[in-house]
């Protein structure tokens, strides 16, 4: 059975929320970055669709004939590897209903509506000072490790899956944050 753990780590007006599926051994993806070991059907989907629909990619919302409620997130930040999964599937703006930021050092020009940032920490700090809803930290683990001091809320979708290896929840972050 899937369980959800909510941990509040701060009291900011605009939060950075790391909402992520995780195996019971602490991995958010397989070594190749795939996440198909995590179930997409089951009781947890009711919570996802009712409380976290803003965190669904735009193409998934369209397939479900849903409109994003716009009541939880208005911005998403993700790492380049996470973003490239969508790009490989031909999806230029996976979260077209949100302001999209991608942490990357690439000098390529992003598609319209997507902002590339080489300094995710500064970008998140600036976003948190602006009016708006919460900021969805979509992944991956290395970006989460980099942004760990700024994460205000951690929502783990713990899955009864053991991956044994892969992308860790906070990448290779070694710092202790309380």
Model-derived segments and spans:
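Enzymes that bind and transform nitrogen-containing heteroaromatic metabolites
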Residues: 2-178
């Amino acid at each position: 059975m899937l369980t959800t753990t909510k941990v509040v780590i701060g009291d900011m007006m605009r939060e950075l929320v790391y909402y992520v599926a995780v195996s019971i051994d602490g991995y958010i993806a397989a070594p190749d970055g795939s996440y198909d070991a995590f179930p997409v059907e089951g009781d947890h989907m009711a919570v996802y669709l009712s409380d976290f629909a803003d965190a669904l990619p735009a193409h998934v919302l369209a397939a479900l004939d849903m409109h994003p409620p716009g009541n939880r997130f208005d911005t998403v930040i993700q790492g380049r590897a996470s973003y490239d999964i969508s790009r490989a599937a031909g999806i230029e703006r996976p979260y077209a209903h949100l302001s999209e930021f991608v942490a990357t050092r690439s000098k390529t020009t992003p598609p319209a509506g997507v902002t590339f940032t080489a300094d995710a920490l500064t970008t998140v700090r600036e976003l948190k000072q602006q009016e708006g809803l919460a900021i969805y930290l979509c992944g991956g683990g290395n970006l989460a490790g980099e942004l760990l001091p700024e994460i205000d809320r951690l929502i783990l979708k713990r899955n009864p899956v053991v991956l044994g290896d892969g992308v860790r929840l906070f990448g290779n972050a070694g710092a202790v944050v309380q």
